[in-house]
Amino acid sequence: MLRGFAPTGVHVVALASGVFLSGAMFSVSAIMIPTLLDTNKEPAGLTTQWARLYHYGSVLMPSMSVAIAAVYGFASTQYRQSPQGMRCLAAGALTLAIAPYTWLAMIPTNNALFAMAASAPGFAGMQDANEKARDLVMKWVVLHSIRSILPLAGAIMGFTGISSGQEGVVGSAN
């Protein structure tokens, strides 16, 4: 424990949740997608399962990022106009950044995979389609792995905000 630093429950929730979100997101790239690649030899199965995985992730992960950013925002209110409070706000912004990153960096790949999933039954047995599907999924893995780092970066930023001292903390003896 850092000398003079006693995190509140809200700090612990923000940090743990940010790290959890990052790990949950990265596990999709590190565990789930390799499983899909190993068990699907046709583009129809691969792209259809990717689309379902994406659907469930798109429901859960952005909602979690909004909730975590709100907790960081609340944590920032425990500091007066100080660098610690600004770091907590930056942590929330980094956590929320998964949405604009998706829009700016991933939409073309996502759309190509969705289009392939919609027409995948017509690709059965076509080697070119199989390679294209696998290449698109692997590109998505790289992009998603980068996106997965954002909540972790937020947690690191949040940790620096809450661990850099108690000066400015509302209710502290300073």
From Swiss-Prot:
Its main location: membrane. It catalyses: emodin anthrone + O2 = emodin + H2O + H(+). Belongs to the anthrone oxygenase family. Induction: Expression correlates with the formation of the sclerotia and thus the pigment production and is directly regulated by the cluster-specific activator CPUR_05433. It is a multi-pass membrane protein. It comes from the Eukaryota. One of its GO terms (molecular function) is monooxygenase activity. GO terms for cellular component: membrane. Pfam families: Anthrone_oxy. The keyword Oxidoreductase applies. The keyword NAD does not apply. This is Anthrone oxygenase CPUR_05435. Its EC number is 1.10.3.-. The chain crosses the membrane at residues 13-33, 56-76, 88-108, 140-160. Keywords: Membrane, Monooxygenase, Oxidoreductase, Transmembrane, Transmembrane helix.
